[in-house]
């Protein structure tokens, strides 16, 4: 999982965070990489049969969001590395000593303990933000990919350091829709445009037949594919993202 950040909100406090993590001196944190959104009323949620009302995915309701800014990209491994290097923060996955990895990223010999109702997620020793599959070093091999194996607490700590905050779920959905109303995707209702897939998702019969090219079987660069109408990249696919 990764996280997208909103720009600072003057007097917002997160009591869950570790107060030993001090804010970075970089007061202009990636400001050039933020998009300011006007906000306003929009239709949040969906009536599609696959939604989970218990998670707030439905029913459709009219919601208002104030003006806010949000980063154009998910937080990358290289950006998260700067945070780790400066603060010496230890993520939850590092504390636990393991995290879950999608089975296709692993050799069969590494596929041991899995999730009972989702056997495609395998428990892997040492998997964390810089070892996405437990072996390959992220900062060396995937610096511009979104950081993964991030808990909600990790995301909050990163925001505290960078002087940003997580978007609310309403803000995130407003941003993801890119100004389109009740469409399945940020570009419309069809997955393909001119026969081309527009996001990094499983392409085939899940979970055993992924027809995506090798470079897109797992995560891909945060600037891959076209942005939505708000100038935001990968607002569907690639990774799950945290909200507040």
Q: What function would you assign to each model-found segment?
A:
Residues 2-30, 55-63, 87-104, 170, ...:
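Surface-exposed recognition segments
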Residues 29, 67, 158-160:
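Short hydrophobic "helix-edge" motifs at membrane interfaces and signal-peptide entry regions
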Residues 37, 43, 47-48, 90, ...:
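Functional-site microenvironments in short loops/helix caps that host divalent-cation chemistry
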Residues 38, 64-66, 71, 85, ...:
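A secondary-structure boundary/capping signal
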Residues 42, 47-66, 135-136:
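Short, conserved catalytic-motif segment at the N-terminal edge
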Residues 76:
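Acidic-aromatic/histidine active-site loop/patch
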């Amino acid at each position: 999982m990764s996280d997208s950040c909103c720009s600072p909100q003057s007097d917002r406090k997160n009591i869950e965070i570790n107060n030993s993590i001090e804010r970075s001196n970089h007061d202009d944190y990636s400001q050039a990489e933020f998009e300011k959104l006007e906000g306003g009323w929009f239709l949040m949620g969906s009536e599609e049969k696959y939604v989970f009302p218990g998670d707030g995915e439905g029913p459709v309701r009219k919601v208002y969001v104030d003006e806010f800014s949000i980063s154009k990209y998910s937080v990358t491994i290289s950006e998260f590395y700067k945070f780790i290097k400066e603060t010496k923060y230890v993520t939850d996955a590092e504390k636990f000593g393991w995290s879950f990895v999608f089975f296709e990223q692993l050799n069969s010999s590494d596929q041991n303990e899995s999730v009972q109702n989702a056997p495609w997620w395998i428990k892997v020793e040492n998997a964390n933000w810089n070892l996405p599959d437990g072996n390959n070093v992220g900062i060396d091999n995937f610096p511009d990919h979104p950081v993964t194996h991030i808990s909600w607490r990790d995301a909050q700590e990163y925001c505290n350091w960078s002087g940003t905050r997580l978007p609310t779920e309403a803000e995130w959905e407003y941003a993801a829709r890119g100004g389109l109303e009740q469409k399945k995707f940020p570009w419309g209702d069809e997955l393909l445009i001119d026969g081309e897939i527009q996001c990094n998702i499983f392409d085939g019969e899940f979970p055993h037949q992924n027809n995506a090219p090798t470079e897109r079987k797992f995560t891909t660069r945060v600037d891959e594919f076209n942005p939505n109408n708000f100038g935001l990249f990968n607002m569907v696919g690639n990774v799950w993202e945290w909200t507040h």
